[in-house]
């Protein structure tokens, strides 16, 4: 009987885990507000570069590959892209959390976002492919 109860409990736990998302999706509207911290150096609404490259359509892009920014990327960022770094959600999250740790030697002065919810929200904003 005790074995059956444990089995049923395990099944219920597995069902609940299967229903709940592994990681909460971010909120694009909240991400737009967080992205204000990035706007001094980056644009996400147009393909215009600023001090940093445009982040419009960054999700899925190979690191250091934006043609219009080639002469400004650090050697480290170009090497990261040549080594296969693609800006998927996981890599963007790691970079936003610790830019110098993810791509040592990159030029970005921003120290990173510490709040995981802010990171998820910025990624949701970038995935939404914001337009003016």
Residue locations for each model-derived region?
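Conserved Rossmann-like nucleotide-binding pocket used by diverse enzymes
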Residues: 20, 34, 109
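Electron-transfer interface patches adjacent to heme c in soluble/periplasmic c-type cytochromes
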Residues: 44-46, 57-90, 110-120
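Bacterial N-terminal signal peptides
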Residues: 9-18
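Short acidic/histidine-centered micro-motifs embedded in hydrophobic/aromatic stretches
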Residues: 54, 58, 125
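C-terminal capping alpha-helices of c-type cytochrome domains
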Residues: 86-132
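Bacterial N-terminal signal peptides that target proteins for export
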Residues: 1-10
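Sequence/structural segment immediately N-terminal to covalent heme-attachment motifs in c-type
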Residues: 25-50, 55
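Sec/Tat signal peptide C-region and signal peptidase I cleavage site
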Residues: 19-25
